[in-house]
């Protein structure tokens, strides 16, 4: 049976106190909407529909980046969850499979949970996702009779016995498309808020003799985000889970609580991560690497045995081959560092390639930007770049070539050549004492007025 996703992303998120739509606030460097879409993507959906409302164009633009094949529809008035799903009807015209309804502000539901919901749909007409709440608070209660879901009772309407139930409603559901929209046509808004509730489908389905069941998942998967405090708590949940997974696969985190990971961070076994390291999106670290304290990595690839930091920054496009060294206060951007090369101190390497076993001296700068365009620097294998060298791109330094300390290299250096490009030193005997005496006299005269 084919599957479609309907992701509700229309809420304004008033408590976020933000100009940004709630679903576009980020957890682990990805919008909450992307987390929901990634989980749903594991079902290989035939269609994906995002229901937008507040700042719909921002949601539309973000959706196009995350999943260009998805359709965005508009809920012009916020008239409840049932009304929101109805806005997806035209986008699902002709679809006869199962529809899974997700929430863009509930980012942690797992692919495994969604797969279990689809499996349960083969046995029931309507499937609701529930969870055992540690503190049921004011959640709606799922009233079960064996495997059958009898009804959903909102907290305010629940009896004392029903409030004692800890199996609660997450809001997520799965249902055949024709059945779902047929039931939604019957949902009314005769309630205090004048809204159309998706949860009314349970009662309507049972009234038509349809079977309804519930699938359970861990409470953490149903965490909804409504405020900045919720967002911070969700970030902490994600980070704790991601760190635990790394520890389980054989990565050493010397101070786990200080390491910040992105949603897509990949780190191989036997890699050591020291304290206060930040991983932005798009980072892969192979096995046996060392990432030292206070380093920041994003959009880069670190190969086996490489050493990074402390206080290093790897920006998008940085590619470190095996056994490379990138040391303290070094920044690498859009550059390939070949096997065994060393860039150990106080250096910027941008839009460049560094050959195998080459040594880059402290203070080296690739001058890659002319104010309008970026240019590349090519450094060959087994070269030696002297400290405080400025490489003015575009420029090439050949294999086994050298640059003298303090050189400003504006011309290509051939294989094996030594390039010296600095002003010749001149010493003036006794001039320093005379100069200092003159300066002190000026200072004294100024002090006297």
Curated annotation (Swiss-Prot):
Binding site for UDP-N-acetyl-alpha-D-glucosamine: 8-11, 22, 75, 80-81, 103-105, 140, 154, 169, 226, 315, 333, 348, 359
Group of enzyme by EC: transferase
Reaction(s) this enzyme catalyzes, per UniProt: alpha-D-glucosamine 1-phosphate + acetyl-CoA = N-acetyl-alpha-D-glucosamine 1-phosphate + CoA + H(+); N-acetyl-alpha-D-glucosamine 1-phosphate + UTP + H(+) = UDP-N-acetyl-alpha-D-glucosamine + diphosphate
Record's subcellular location: Cytoplasm
Region (N-acetyltransferase): 250-449
Pfam (any one): Hexapep
Gene Ontology CC entries for this record: cytoplasm; membrane
Positions of region (Linker): 229-249
Keyword line: Acyltransferase, Cell shape, Cell wall biogenesis/degradation, Cytoplasm, Magnesium, Metal-binding, Multifunctional enzyme, Nucleotidyltransferase, Peptidoglycan synthesis, Repeat, Transferase
Span list, region Pyrophosphorylase: 1-228
Active site residues of this protein: 345 (proton acceptor)
EC number annotated for this UniProt entry: 2.7.7.23, 2.3.1.157
Binding site for Mg(2+): 105, 226
Cofactor(s) demanded: Mg(2+)
GO-annotated biological processes: cell morphogenesis; cell wall organization; lipid A biosynthetic process; peptidoglycan biosynthetic process; regulation of cell shape; UDP-N-acetylglucosamine biosynthetic process
Cofactor details (free text): Binds 1 Mg(2+) ion per subunit.
GO MF, any single term: magnesium ion binding
Residues the record lists as binding acetyl-CoA: 362, 368-369, 387, 405, 422
Annotated family: In the N-terminal section; belongs to the N-acetylglucosamine-1-phosphate uridyltransferase family. In the C-terminal section; belongs to the transferase hexapeptide repeat family.
Subunit organization: Homotrimer.
Described function: Catalyzes the last two sequential reactions in the de novo biosynthetic pathway for UDP-N-acetylglucosamine (UDP-GlcNAc). The C-terminal domain catalyzes the transfer of acetyl group from acetyl coenzyme A to glucosamine-1-phosphate (GlcN-1-P) to produce N-acetylglucosamine-1-phosphate (GlcNAc-1-P), which is converted into UDP-GlcNAc by the transfer of uridine 5-monophosphate (from uridine 5-triphosphate), a reaction catalyzed by the N-terminal domain.
Xref: PANTHER family: BIFUNCTIONAL PROTEIN GLMU, NUCLEOTIDYL TRANSFERASE
Name of the protein described by the UniProt record: Bifunctional protein GlmU
Organism: Ruegeria sp. (strain TM1040) (Silicibacter sp.)
